Amino acid sequence: MYNLQEITEKARKAIDALQDNSIESLEAIRVEYFGKKGHFTQLMQGLRDVSAEERPAVGAKINEAKQKVQAILNAKKVEWEEIALNERLAQERIDVSLPGRKMELGGLHPVSITINRVVQFFSKLGFTVEIGPEIETDYYNFDALNIPKHHPARADHDTFWFDAERLLRTQTSGVQIRTMEKMCPPIRIMAPGKVYRNDYDQTHTPMFHQIELLYVDKKANFTELKGLLHDFLRAFFEEDLQVRFRPSYFPFTEPSAEVDVMGKNGKWLEVLGCGMVHPNVLRNVGIDPNEYSGFAVGMGVERLTMLRYNVTDLRSFFENDLRFLKQFK
């Protein structure tokens, strides 16, 4: 037991004598006393030479000494780790007078900004938002809109077909049909959404956004339509714009018109299409065209956005270039 006391005291003094605050030095002492060939390990191995009667008592004393030395080692390690932490914190002191790093907030996409502006304007006039499926049937995308099979207008749509009956919608007009099937006049709706056409260049992309308006009532007329669009375009562009209506052709409206605004360069710029709902379209949904009339408006969201913000390339909206998108925050 004298050897045990001597080893314990020697370990304690060795730990107390350390001055370099080095964890490596503590580890060296731990290995010296508790490693595979350490002093306490050898004492435990020597228990086989102790008589069976004395072995439990001797083993208990060795374990008690081991625990005492281990506790001193642990305490010294905690002390030095705390010193090292305080020194590191002192070197990394934070100057609270410096301005903090600002969190960069995202913003709405310019297309979303335009959709919100359009929806907000027409909501004040009693129009409600309706949505429909982007995978549409041939009936809702064409037939019900007075565009039967083999109609030449179908060729203008550059349609993505899944099979003979299903397609990616080329216009949001199908929402008008679905709405008129489930609602009775008077009807005031707007249908924002994605549409798809097989075209890609500076002014066309395979996917883009449209907003359609539909108004059906007993006294809907073209004069109302013109006044509504005059007010909308001046509110949207925040200018007293010169607006003109040109005769045009759409299978689902009669008469039909395209609407232009005078640009800052003195040239007319096309912004949307419109017209009175064709009687055949009303008949297809069970509405009597002799009792009710209606008008419809279709506008390309990207087109409006390009004109409002002077964007020259439609593809910029889909490239996710932060230098471009940050301009709209």
From Swiss-Prot:
Keywords: Aminoacyl-tRNA synthetase, ATP-binding, Cytoplasm, Ligase, Magnesium, Metal-binding, Nucleotide-binding, Protein biosynthesis. Its main location: cytoplasm. It holds the Pfam family tRNA-synt_2d. GO terms for molecular function: ATP binding; magnesium ion binding; phenylalanine-tRNA ligase activity; tRNA binding. GO terms for cellular component: cytoplasm. Mg(2+) binds at residue 254. Its EC number is 6.1.1.20. Its cofactor is Mg(2+). It catalyses: tRNA(Phe) + L-phenylalanine + ATP = L-phenylalanyl-tRNA(Phe) + AMP + diphosphate + H(+). The keyword Protease does not apply. GO terms for biological process: phenylalanyl-tRNA aminoacylation. It is found in: Cytoplasm. Binds 2 magnesium ions per tetramer. Gene3D superfamilies: Bira Bifunctional Protein, Domain 2. Tetramer of two alpha and two beta subunits. Belongs to the class-II aminoacyl-tRNA synthetase family. Phe-tRNA synthetase alpha subunit type 1 subfamily. This is Phenylalanine--tRNA ligase alpha subunit. It comes from Histophilus somni (strain 129Pt).
